[in-house]
Each structure stands twice: as C-alpha cells, then as structure tokens.
C-alpha cells in the first residue's frame, strides 16, 4: 500500500485520520506522517492500517499495466 493509496482509501471509506488511527489502535501521527511522505510505519502498523481499510470496504488495485489505486468493494 502506497501513501497515496492509504489517503485515497481512507477518504473513500469516509474516515478521518483520527478515526482510522482509533480503529487501528495506532497513533494518528503515524497515518499523517505516512500519507504526507514524512515517515514509514512499522510493517505491523502498515498491515493494521490496510486491514482496517479493507474491513471498511476498500480494495487495493495493484496492476503493473494500469498502476496502483483503490476502489470500493462491490
């Protein structure tokens, strides 16, 4: 999951950084820093962020031909 996918997925899911952090049980600054390119979360924190976004209905698109992105699960 790229920082852009994190931000787009969070917004598409209708979550603020604070809400995502609360559900993922991590500091909101980790999300802010990751989305802005300032920092990189530990692998376990990144996995938890992705898990919460997937729980919220986000699908991560990772395609060599079309690039990466996010979409709402049907």
Predicted regions mapped to residue ranges:
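DNA major-groove recognition helix of helix-turn-helix/homeodomain DNA-binding modules
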Residues: 44-61
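Recognition helix of helix-turn-helix/homeodomain-like DNA-binding domains
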Residues: 25-41
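Mobile acidic interaction elements
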Residues: 3-6, 32, 64
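Short basic helix-loop element that most often maps to the first helix and adjoining turn
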Residues: 4-19
């Amino acid at each position: 999951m790229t920082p852009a996918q994190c931000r787009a997925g969070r917004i598409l899911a209708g979550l603020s950084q604070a809400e995502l952090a609360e559900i993922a049980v991590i500091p909101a600054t980790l999300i802010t820093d990751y989305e802005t390119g300032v920092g990189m979360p530990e692998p376990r924190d990144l996995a938890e962020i992705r898990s919460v976004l997937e729980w919220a209905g986000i699908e991560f698109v990772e395609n060599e031909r079309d690039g990466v992105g996010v979409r709402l699960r049907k």
